[in-house]
């Protein structure tokens, strides 16, 4: 892997893409230290360490720790993710949008523009909601001296957060276009990873004071390493469906006759279902948690808190659900069967046409079942281990680990494809799932 990474840096274009990505991510981290005007950061951080403030943990995680600093990126990029989920649902139920989605590159460009506008509008609503229901509550308990809750303060918060979201979207698009990997995923990835070191140092401090057992900490680290290895193996695992192309003789030339395969991954949906699950889970927490004096709304926020059994159960269900939904969107057996028949290909032992469609659907449904169950298990296990060891860290939650591994592998896969085009050895070894054709 080190050899492959060194090879990547030897290619000027690839080196420029990697450096550009790192520079944009560094700029994103610098934004974490630009606070929203008028907000008392010390009081917010003190509140988030309490039991009541702990419910904001998942929001703080996906903002990369920006929520506890209430920087210009306090909302992170999750408003855009939520808007993307809403837009995908609308595309399936609104005929005009469905038609637009089938109009090629131009249609997708327009839908992406709608999603950006929706993300910024949602960010404006969330900024106003936080300014009025959270920051300005109880006479402005989280405001600096000289500031008071009112229209001017609300305006400042909304403008600051909208500018932050717009800047994050611009950064994400620049990474996707000129860098390596998916910009949106990498921003979430960077936000989670930078929280690891403070969490580890905090845990070491607890070990020194005797609040955390050293053996429990080592057991926790061993589990994290094993979880990484298991997730990487599953993300790479694939089932290869053999494909044979019929031979055609045209004059003195023979065309076709090659044997190849269709790779179907155990987790074909990648990291998107996990990010979508986190975005959906944040909505009720975000809407209910700011109302500290309302026991009903606090009960709702605690119910969806992923550190609680109820919230963890919902999180697992959402991961499994979105894995099925997104796999269905990504993998179309009918389109693949039509493509095979058009080019004279067939799966040995399976007739072309409808039998091929049903065969591929059967294979995908089985792989998706095991892949979804694995993702659900990995979402669940870290929380159980944290409860057993007494080491509680939202940064090392199952959903956080899944996103880190998924985004890292997707990015390495893009780098590898660039290396393979230039006849270099890649990063990743291929996993294989052996099975019968039926």
Curated annotation (Swiss-Prot):
<feature type="transmembrane region" description="Helical; Name=6">
    <location>
        <begin position="215"/>
        <end position="231"/>
    </location>
</feature>
<keyword id="KW-0813">Transport</keyword>
<feature type="intramembrane region">
    <location>
        <begin position="68"/>
        <end position="71"/>
    </location>
</feature>
<feature type="topological domain" description="Cytoplasmic">
    <location>
        <begin position="176"/>
        <end position="182"/>
    </location>
</feature>
<comment type="similarity">
    <text>Belongs to the SecY/SEC61-alpha family.</text>
</comment>
<keyword id="KW-0997">Cell inner membrane</keyword>
<feature type="topological domain" description="Cytoplasmic">
    <location>
        <begin position="409"/>
        <end position="438"/>
    </location>
</feature>
<dbReference type="InterPro" id="IPR023201">
    <property type="entry name" value="SecY_dom_sf"/>
</dbReference>
<protein>
    <recommendedName>
        <fullName>Protein translocase subunit SecY</fullName>
    </recommendedName>
</protein>
<comment type="subunit">
    <text>Component of the Sec protein translocase complex. Heterotrimer consisting of SecY, SecE and SecG subunits. The heterotrimers can form oligomers, although 1 heterotrimer is thought to be able to translocate proteins. Interacts with the ribosome. Interacts with SecDF, and other proteins may be involved. Interacts with SecA.</text>
</comment>
<feature type="topological domain" description="Cytoplasmic">
    <location>
        <begin position="1"/>
        <end position="18"/>
    </location>
</feature>
<feature type="transmembrane region" description="Discontinuously helical; Name=2">
    <location>
        <begin position="57"/>
        <end position="87"/>
    </location>
</feature>
<feature type="topological domain" description="Periplasmic">
    <location>
        <begin position="131"/>
        <end position="157"/>
    </location>
</feature>
<dbReference type="GO" id="GO:0005886">
    <property type="term" value="C:plasma membrane"/>
</dbReference>
<keyword id="KW-0811">Translocation</keyword>
<feature type="transmembrane region" description="Helical; Name=5">
    <location>
        <begin position="183"/>
        <end position="201"/>
    </location>
</feature>
<feature type="topological domain" description="Cytoplasmic">
    <location>
        <begin position="88"/>
        <end position="114"/>
    </location>
</feature>
<comment type="function">
    <text>The central subunit of the protein translocation channel SecYEG. Consists of two halves formed by TMs 1-5 and 6-10. These two domains form a lateral gate at the front which open onto the bilayer between TMs 2 and 7, and are clamped together by SecE at the back. The channel is closed by both a pore ring composed of hydrophobic SecY resides and a short helix (helix 2A) on the extracellular side of the membrane which forms a plug. The plug probably moves laterally to allow the channel to open. The ring and the pore may move independently.</text>
</comment>
<keyword id="KW-0812">Transmembrane</keyword>
<keyword id="KW-1133">Transmembrane helix</keyword>
<feature type="transmembrane region" description="Helical; Name=9">
    <location>
        <begin position="373"/>
        <end position="389"/>
    </location>
</feature>
<dbReference type="InterPro" id="IPR026593">
    <property type="entry name" value="SecY"/>
</dbReference>
<feature type="intramembrane region" description="Helical; Name=Helix 2B">
    <location>
        <begin position="72"/>
        <end position="87"/>
    </location>
</feature>
<feature type="topological domain" description="Periplasmic">
    <location>
        <begin position="390"/>
        <end position="392"/>
    </location>
</feature>
<feature type="intramembrane region" description="Helical; Name=Helix 2A">
    <location>
        <begin position="57"/>
        <end position="67"/>
    </location>
</feature>
<feature type="transmembrane region" description="Helical; Name=8">
    <location>
        <begin position="304"/>
        <end position="323"/>
    </location>
</feature>
<feature type="topological domain" description="Periplasmic">
    <location>
        <begin position="202"/>
        <end position="214"/>
    </location>
</feature>
<feature type="transmembrane region" description="Helical; Name=1">
    <location>
        <begin position="19"/>
        <end position="34"/>
    </location>
</feature>
<dbReference type="InterPro" id="IPR002208">
    <property type="entry name" value="SecY/SEC61-alpha"/>
</dbReference>
<keyword id="KW-1003">Cell membrane</keyword>
<dbReference type="GO" id="GO:0043952">
    <property type="term" value="P:protein transport by the Sec complex"/>
</dbReference>
<feature type="topological domain" description="Periplasmic">
    <location>
        <begin position="35"/>
        <end position="56"/>
    </location>
</feature>
<feature type="transmembrane region" description="Helical; Name=4">
    <location>
        <begin position="158"/>
        <end position="175"/>
    </location>
</feature>
<feature type="topological domain" description="Cytoplasmic">
    <location>
        <begin position="232"/>
        <end position="271"/>
    </location>
</feature>
<feature type="topological domain" description="Cytoplasmic">
    <location>
        <begin position="324"/>
        <end position="372"/>
    </location>
</feature>
<keyword id="KW-0472">Membrane</keyword>
<keyword id="KW-0653">Protein transport</keyword>
<dbReference type="InterPro" id="IPR030659">
    <property type="entry name" value="SecY_CS"/>
</dbReference>
<feature type="transmembrane region" description="Helical; Name=7">
    <location>
        <begin position="272"/>
        <end position="288"/>
    </location>
</feature>
<dbReference type="GO" id="GO:0065002">
    <property type="term" value="P:intracellular protein transmembrane transport"/>
</dbReference>
<feature type="transmembrane region" description="Helical; Name=10">
    <location>
        <begin position="393"/>
        <end position="408"/>
    </location>
</feature>
<feature type="transmembrane region" description="Helical; Name=3">
    <location>
        <begin position="115"/>
        <end position="130"/>
    </location>
</feature>
């Amino acid at each position: 892997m080190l050899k492959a990474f060194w090879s990547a840096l030897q290619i000027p274009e690839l080196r420029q893409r990697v450096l550009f990505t790192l520079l944009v991510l560094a700029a994103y981290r610098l934004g974490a230290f630009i606070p929203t005007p008028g907000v008392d950061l010390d009081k917010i951080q003190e509140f988030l360490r309490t039991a009541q403030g702990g419910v904001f943990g998942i929001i703080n995680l996906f903002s990369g720790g920006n929520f506890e600093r209430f920087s210009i990126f306090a909302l992170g990029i999750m408003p855009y993710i939520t808007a993307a989920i809403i837009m995908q649902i609308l595309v399936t139920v609104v005929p005009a949008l469905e038609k637009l989605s089938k109009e090629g590159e131009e249609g997708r460009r327009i839908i992406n523009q709608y999603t950006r506008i929706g993300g910024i509008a949602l960010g404006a609503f969330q900024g106003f909601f936080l300014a009025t229901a959270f920051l300005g509550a109880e006479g402005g308990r989280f405001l600096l001296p000289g500031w008071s809750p009112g229209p001017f303060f609300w305006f400042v918060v909304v403008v600051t957060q909208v500018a932050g979201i717009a800047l994050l979207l611009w950064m994400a698009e620049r990474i996707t276009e000129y860098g390596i990997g998916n910009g949106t995923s990498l921003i979430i990835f960077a936000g989670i990873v930078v929280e690891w070191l403070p969490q580890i140092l905090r845990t070491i401090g607890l070990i020194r004071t005797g609040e955390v057992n050293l053996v429990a900490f080592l057991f926790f680290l061993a589990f994290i390493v094993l979880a990484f290895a298991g997730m990487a193996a599953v993300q790479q695992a694939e089932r290869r469906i053999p494909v044979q192309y019929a031979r055609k003789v045209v004059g003195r030339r023979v065309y076709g006759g090659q044997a190849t395969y269709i790779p179907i991954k155990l987790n074909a949906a990648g990291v998107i279902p996990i990010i979508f699950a986190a975005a959906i889970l944040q909505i009720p927490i975000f809407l209910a948690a700011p109302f500290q004096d309302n026991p009903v709304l606090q009960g709702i926020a605690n119910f969806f808190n992923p550190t609680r059994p109820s919230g963890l159960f919902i999180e697992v269900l959402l991961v499994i659900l979105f894995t099925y939904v997104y796999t269905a969107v990504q993998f179309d057996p009918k389109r693949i069967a039509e493509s095979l028949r058009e080019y004279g290909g067939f799966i040995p032992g399976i007739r072309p046409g409808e039998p091929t469609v049903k065969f591929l659907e059967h294979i995908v449904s089985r792989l998706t079942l095991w892949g979804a169950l694995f993702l659900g298990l990995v979402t669940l296990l870290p929380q159980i281990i944290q409860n057993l060891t007494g080491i509680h860290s939202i940064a090392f939650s199952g959903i956080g680990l899944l996103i880190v591994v998924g985004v890292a592998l997707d990015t390495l896969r893009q780098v590898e494809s660039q290396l393979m085009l230039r006849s270099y050895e890649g990063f990743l070894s291929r996993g294989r799932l052996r099975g019968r054709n039926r």
